[in-house]
Amino acid sequence: MPNETNCTLDFEQSVQLFKEYNLFITAFLLFLTIILQYGYATRSKVIYTLKMIVLWCFWPLNIAVGVISCTYPPNTGGLVAAIILTVFACLSFVGYWIQSIRLFKRCRSWWSFNPESNAVGSILLTNGQQCNFAIESVPMVLSPIIKNGVLYCEGQWLAKCEPDHLPKDIFVCTPDRRNIYRMVQKYTGDQSGNKKRFATFVYAKQSVDTGELESVATGGSSLYT
């Protein structure tokens, strides 16, 4: 009979393996902690992009581990649990792509594939430029500001513009809805009276429909910049 090799690690081998790779494990966990804790669109777009890549990798990694668990189950109960968890992971991953593609068709923004949220804010400036930004939910009020000639919304840098470039309506899109916000108040000028230096706009949620942003674009340069 052929010799069978036992590939199971005993306690001492496990400790030795951990000692050899503990520095790598520490560095890897520290990297994940920094990315997940400090990866915000309002702080650093580079770290936020790395965070998105890490989150995107979690689902395929989870599915791969689930397939391995199904291939090498510890027992019958473990096989059933592995199948259920793997199917759930696959359905969740497919559902994410379906919702993201639907949102992309509505607003034509790569923010649609943001795994942290299911909504994208869009401001169609009167000069034809479209500014998209990540938003976690659909709020009742949005307050974009212009500071030193730069437009910000939800704390995110969007574009250089003038107060006159802000439209009457802005939008927050979800996979199945387009939420329309109407400008209800506008404050311009700072303490020095410079109206181009600082401006605050208040938009209140006005209505909801199923339209796409393309249907409200009129002239100007490319809508999807």
Swiss-Prot record:
Virion surface compartment segments: 1-20, 73-77
Taxonomy, superkingdom: Viruses
Annotated transmembrane regions: 21-41, 52-72, 78-98
rRNA processing is among the record's keywords: no
Subcellular location: Virion membrane; Host Golgi apparatus membrane
GO cellular component: host cell Golgi membrane; membrane; viral envelope; virion membrane
InterPro entries (UniProt xref): GAMMA_CORONA_M, M_CoV
Subunit text: Homomultimer. Interacts with envelope E protein in the budding compartment of the host cell, which is located between endoplasmic reticulum and the Golgi complex. Forms a complex with HE and S proteins. Interacts with nucleocapsid N protein. This interaction probably participates in RNA packaging into the virus.
Name of the protein in its database record: Membrane protein
Source organism of this protein record: Avian infectious bronchitis virus (strain Beaudette)
